[in-house]
Amino acid sequence: MSDVENQPFFNIQRVYLKDMSLEQPNSPAIFLEQDMPSVEVEVDVKADRLAESVFEVVVSGTVTAKVKDKVAFLIEAKQAGIFDIRNIPDEQLDPLVGIACPTILFPYLRSNIADAITRAGFPPIHLAEINFQALYEQRLAQLQQQAGAAAGAPNGTTLN
């Protein structure tokens, strides 16, 4: 093999909106409310290996806005990307898939969610940037904690 074939390789094959849903259970009455909504945002990242060097990474976002305990809207969206990643050492592959890929996808997710909110008749909500490295490190710490708890469980049982 030549040196070119062994060079680290990272390529975005495709970025796409995998799923999106919008619910407005209290419209049109909710449009008459004068109070500002409270907004909750949840984000998650999942990755699947599709082939030896091809990964699908999905950043999921859920935005719930409430006015006086009434749901104004609920948006769930999944922004996905297919990435071709080759000749990356195993110890660097997981952080690349868990940090770099979601960082690439999140602006698309944020834009799609903001567009859906305004098209639904609500004032724009702009999601803040997310530190995917901190999210990744937090997930690793949780996995290590779970592994440690499972290793300490008597008779091979796992703790929940």
Curated annotation (Swiss-Prot):
UniProt xrefs under Pfam families: SecB (PF02556)
GO terms for MF: unfolded protein binding
GO BP annotations listed: protein folding; protein tetramerization; protein transport
Free-text function comment from the UniProt entry: One of the proteins required for the normal export of preproteins out of the cell cytoplasm. It is a molecular chaperone that binds to a subset of precursor proteins, maintaining them in a translocation-competent state. It also specifically binds to its receptor SecA.
Highest taxon of the lineage: Bacteria
Descriptive protein name: Protein-export protein SecB
The organism of origin for this protein: Burkholderia lata (strain ATCC 17760 / DSM 23089 / LMG 22485 / NCIMB 9086 / R18194 / 383)
InterPro entries linked to this entry: SecB (IPR003708), SecB-like_sf (IPR035958)
Subcellular location: Cytoplasm
